[in-house]
Amino acid sequence: MAGAALSGEGRAMVQTSQEFYQLRKYTLTTGPQLALTQSYFEHALIPALNQMSIGPVGAFKLDIGPETPTYYLLIPATSVETLAMLETRLAADTQFRKAATAFWEAPAAAPPCVRVETTLLSAFAGWPKLVAPKTEKRIFQLRTYESATDAAHIRKVEMFNEAEIAIFVRTGLAPVFFGDTLIGHRMPSLTYMLTFEDVADLNKKWAVFASDPAWKELSKRPGNTDPEIVSNISNLYLSPLSFSQI
């Protein structure tokens, strides 16, 4: 069961102001798949999504993390229905199908990618809409927190909404989105993305956050400590592809 279904975020998710996200992971092999997939994103998929009034769409390359080469797509929408019907609408779009031919109709002996995995997320009440960075020079950090139980997961989401997001912003961290996993393979879990100028900027800002008195007090409260509510954290470093809209 998705954590959001049990929490305040679940009750709020019917609000049209709160976004939903598809986070797509494209696992690739080095070689022709890289250029083919990038071309598919740039010339077929992202233009088709924009024609559906979906965007901005983020397109990223995994720089630090397991399973390289890997690309990620972040697709925002104002409703679950929009994301659920995405493949059906794309399949019926003749202009998209023509532009996507090389990717969609690649032979089985030369597939365009190894595998595509999709996670469906609902935006946190405390950060209901994606915020795209305005700087040209940027990297991204994609973090996923898994919890041992639904109750622990709900408490971690509440912790973000009640105080942790505000501490992030006050100490200079720049969130792009926060999402509660509704459908995915690592549940219960949440995922969020931050943006920085470079790795040095990332390390500097995390150090400020870690030393913040309000964060130290919040994270030490009974019920808020990592051993109680977080069972695993994954941490990926991404860079935007040249045509990324985020």
Predicted region positions:
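Short S/T/G/P-rich N-terminal loop/turn motif that feeds into the first structured element of a domain
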Residues: 1-97, 102-215, 225-246
